[in-house]
Amino acid sequence: MITRLKKLPFKLPLVLVAIILGSISMLSFKAAKFRSDPYMVQIPGGSFYMGPSDEQVDMAMVNRKKLVSITGFWMDRTEVTNQQYRKFVKYVSDSLKYLAVYAGGVNQTEDTVKVDWNRALRINTNSKAVIEKLNELLLSPDNRIQGKVEIDPTKLIYRYSYVDLKAAAKSSKGLEQPLSNFLVSQTEAVYPDSLVWMRDFSYSYNEPFTRLYFSHPSYNHYPVVGVTWKQAIAFCHWRTNNSNFYLDKGNKKDEKIDGIYRLPTEAEWEYAARGNSKTNNMYPWGSPYTRTKEGRLLANFKPGRGDYFGSDAKNDNIYTSKVQSYPENAYKLFDMAGNVAEWTSSVYYEGGNNFIGDFSPDLQ
């Protein structure tokens, strides 16, 4: 399954870049009796020309088009929203509070201490005794605004581990070695960088977005921004575990996902963005034009210098737009061009299309 996470909070000039969380082959889903997430759509396998579009002659000098085949997967219909990502942040916050109050410290992991969520969600943070135990999670007194006691966002650390299958595959005796030899442990601060609004827009008044964009409910259905690649990976890991936790809790173990949520590869993202188009057009809607016949913009981007409206009276998306604000593509995916940049699992390498494989290609 694939989750789409956003990297930057600004409009791009129709750049096809994405963050997708976790793809699973369709065969795996059937074997697991998987109930598809209502926010996801099934992308059928197929072949397409990966690389520059026909109109991008200058790009052909760097990355040539290459015919590749992609196996089927599921993908989020929209970018991951502020509301969805806040659930991840709240999970980390609540679990750390539980470890601090009931397990003797936040450095414990859920591998050794299981969080009792009935108790975790009832922790009284107004109690002086509780505040004393939470001290290692709180802002230091000299960093508090008007003396308000709050959680330090930099201390919201998510700890997880995974098996490095690539490392195991490189070893000639990978199957004979203990699993611990290939077990990788990671820690990642999960709170997004809200200062990206200030950093990416020089000489521009964006303080309100820095203060409110991630936390205010008015932006619930806007794409989360300021998320690093490592934070996106951590979110994918949490989403997999969280989904399986609720299936376990509901005694639906036979429906657990036979796979993981993850970021998409660049090839998967581009294949999904093109929306089954055979014309190799530049844009996901299958034409070389950026407007409808009525003059409406087909994506959230900057039409011209100093012009964020594009003479479109109904376009009020000066910055990011709410998910599903623009038409979906043939695969029923939204914002596969414009709005904000998205992460993939692949590493960018100039000329990479010249040597990647032609079956589910990836470069890491």
Model-derived features with residue positions:
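Intrinsic disorder/low-complexity segments enriched in polar/small residues
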Residues: 7-8, 12, 133, 295-297
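Bacterial Sec-dependent N-terminal signal peptides
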Residues: 1-39, 272
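Sterically constrained small-residue positions within well-ordered secondary structures
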Residues: 8, 13, 31-34, 59-61, ...
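Functional-site microenvironments in short loops/helix caps that host divalent-cation chemistry
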Residues: 30, 42-43, 49, 54, ...
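A short glycine-rich, aromatic-capped structural motif
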Residues: 34-214, 220-240, 338
